[in-house]
Amino acid sequence: MPVKDSSSNKKNQIGKLSERQRRILEVITDAVSLRGYPPSIREIGDAAGLQSTSSVAYQLKELEKKGYLRRDPNKPRAVDVRALPDPIPSKPGRKPGPKKSSVAISPDPAETSPTSFVPIVGSIAAGNPILAEENVDGYFPFPSEIVGDGDLFMLQVEGESMRDAGILHHDWVVVRSQPVAEQGEFVAALIEGEATVKEFHSDSSGVWLLPHNDAFDPIPAEHAEIMGKVVSILRKL
């Protein structure tokens, strides 16, 4: 039985890219080179002419299958470009442009401090991972000494229920993902598909999510899903 040349097959497979897939690779490598972290799903879609996040997710999976990308299943937005396709052959009479480099430009360590790129989460659906691709709108850089470590994400506060605690309408909160909370901690919780920020409280009468505004009532939390603990607040003045 003849033995197939697997390396030759792989080479043929890795060359089969559409123009759109080439564009997606360019967008990712350019973003990593310029700012040190990959673009969001929506940024990729805008640059590649894809309207839906599911279409972008599909193209990323195809690029991963073809060996151009490697993705960390535990970090939905971690994307590592493994290879770049050969340049598209130029038309007769034209010189090919310079070949792009896939090497990311590293900032001078002396001018930088440890930074956490925190995903900005838009709408959250019950039962879906918080950091699922379709939930993340982008990233925001924070000094690690401010937000700490762990799996972090950002939510924008809607409403005045935490006003007296200094958490105002349209503030951004940085949340460390964890399924449990301690007494008195501010948490982000999911109730009937809606995210809310409240104080966690437990006593003989049950578990409650407490507002910090007398105009709002405590919320029973028996059926709430604790998404994490609020660790920082960001406000635009």
UniProtKB/Swiss-Prot annotation:
Record-level Gene Ontology MF annotations: DNA binding; serine-type endopeptidase activity
Bias type Polar residues, positions: 1-12
Keyword Hydrolase: yes
Ranges that cross the membrane: none
Catalytic activity: Hydrolysis of Ala-|-Gly bond in repressor LexA
Keyword terms of this UniProt record: Autocatalytic cleavage, DNA damage, DNA repair, DNA replication, DNA-binding, Hydrolase, Repressor, SOS response, Transcription, Transcription regulation
Top-tier EC class: hydrolase
Pfam families according to UniProt: LexA_DNA_bind, Peptidase_S24
One example of a Gene Ontology biological process annotation: DNA replication
Quaternary state and interactors: Homodimer.
Functional description taken from the UniProt entry: Represses a number of genes involved in the response to DNA damage (SOS response), including recA and lexA. In the presence of single-stranded DNA, RecA interacts with LexA causing an autocatalytic cleavage which disrupts the DNA-binding part of LexA, leading to derepression of the SOS regulon and eventually DNA repair.
Family: Belongs to the peptidase S24 family.
Protein name: LexA repressor
Native organism: Corynebacterium diphtheriae (strain ATCC 700971 / NCTC 13129 / Biotype gravis)
Upper classification of the organism: Bacteria, Bacillati, Actinomycetota, Actinomycetes, Mycobacteriales
Gene name in the database record: lexA
